[in-house]
Amino acid sequence: MLIIELLKAIFFGIIEGITEWLPVSSTGHLILVQEFIRLNQDKAFIEMFNIIIQLGAIIAVMLIYFERLNPFQPGKTAREVQLTWQLWLKVVIACIPSILIAVPLDNWFEAHFYFMVPIAIALIVYGIAFIWIEKQNAQQEPAVTDLARMSYKTAFFIGCFQVLSIVPGTSRSGATILGAIILGTSRTVAADFTFFLAIPTMFGYSGLKAVKFFLDGHHLDFAQVLILLVASLTAFVVSLLAIRFLTDYVKKHDFTIFGKYRIVLGSLLLIYSFFKFVF
């Protein structure tokens, strides 16, 4: 029944909207949830669905930060316009590693890593990394506390960290936030740049998935279009709340709690995978 599929789409949209911006891996969570709750659709559609619904989350970022990211915003001074263009150039530079490395390798990683055990291991490894990095930085003041002071070189290396998210369970936001902190930015700068970097990265990735879907001879019927729209709209609404939460959270707290969450979830998944294999 279509109504059941739409309810599932809403549920998946909620998962996407929450986990896309928290450093816990949205794709990993969607794959995990679909182990128990699946759309009654073919594999090709589900793989495309997991990526396309990220567009709702991206539109939420564009809405929240529209004035800041718009170089043509009325009332901006010449200096503010210059800084906006410089920010976009940093974002473009940070996309280069993904274009050169992640895009060519995407199909291979999708074929070999999109199942439970690699996701669980990635959750645990990066959970440990978050806790360790936060402990190392506890007594250190960040060198970069404003995006305007972040160098193009730093932006490029943050983009290199983003490539790590090609492994499901890593988290794109987690990899870039972790990388930015290692490179000396404050948590606020790390979170903001992660939001901005997501716009071209995820638009591009979603576009590639959509093109591949149609080039492979697939098509969308009315029900599938409706499922995509409902899930994306839900992800958009939930993302508005999740982004606000994270931007407020990082002003007062570190990312240790997310590291602990990742370790617990990853461990439970390994146990689940073991019993599933045995029984």
UniProtKB/Swiss-Prot annotation:
GO terms (BP aspect): cell wall organization; peptidoglycan biosynthetic process; regulation of cell shape; response to antibiotic
Keyword Transmembrane found: yes
Cited InterPro entries: UppP
Organism domain of life: Bacteria
TM helices/strands, residue ranges: 2-22, 44-64, 85-105, 113-133, 163-183, 188-208, 223-243, 255-275
EC number: 3.6.1.27
Subcellular localization: Cell membrane
GO annotations of cellular component type: plasma membrane
Bilayer disposition of the protein: Multi-pass membrane protein
Keyword Cell membrane: yes
GO terms, molecular function: undecaprenyl-diphosphatase activity
Reactions the enzyme catalyzes: di-trans,octa-cis-undecaprenyl diphosphate + H2O = di-trans,octa-cis-undecaprenyl phosphate + phosphate + H(+)
Protein keywords: Antibiotic resistance, Cell membrane, Cell shape, Cell wall biogenesis/degradation, Hydrolase, Membrane, Peptidoglycan synthesis, Transmembrane, Transmembrane helix
Leftover remarks: Bacitracin is thought to be involved in the inhibition of peptidoglycan synthesis by sequestering undecaprenyl diphosphate, thereby reducing the pool of lipid carrier available.
Function: Catalyzes the dephosphorylation of undecaprenyl diphosphate (UPP). Confers resistance to bacitracin.
Family membership noted in the UniProt record: Belongs to the UppP family.
Protein name, as recorded: Undecaprenyl-diphosphatase
Record organism: Streptococcus pyogenes serotype M49 (strain NZ131)
Lineage: Bacteria, Bacillati, Bacillota, Bacilli, Lactobacillales
Gene field: uppP
